[in-house]
């Protein structure tokens, strides 16, 4: 993946900018930049043509500080861990901004 287009790095940069504006404590800021938990699984699937293909799946729970981690799942062969990380982080902020008592997560 092109480093300049890394979705997780883009979301972290947006967070860093806003954390700077808000004057967040550096230790809290560093904690909030990364996920609480990441799960990577490899699942073998028997295909219709008789072959077996292995798929990699990701589940990222960015934060459960405000409640259970909420977030959907994306089914796409080109899904990446960094995309799922970025989307989970954004789900944390979306829930917090509208005062929904849930954390952020995503799967893919």
Question: Which role fits each region the language model picked out?
Answer:
Residues 1-108:
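N-terminal ligand-binding/catalytic initiation module
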């Amino acid at each position: 993946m092109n480093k300049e287009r890394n979705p997780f790095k883009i979301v972290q940069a947006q967070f860093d900018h806003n954390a700077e504006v808000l004057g967040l404590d550096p230790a809290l800021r560093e904690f909030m930049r990364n996920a609480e938990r990441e799960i990577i699984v490899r699942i073998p699937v028997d295909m219709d043509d008789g072959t077996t293909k292995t798929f990699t799946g990701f589940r990222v729970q960015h934060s459960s500080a405000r409640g259970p981690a909420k977030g959907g799942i994306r089914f796409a062969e080109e899904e990446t861990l960094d995309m799922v990380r970025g989307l989970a982080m954004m789900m944390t902020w979306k829930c917090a901004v509208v005062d929904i008592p849930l954390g952020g997560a995503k799967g893919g």
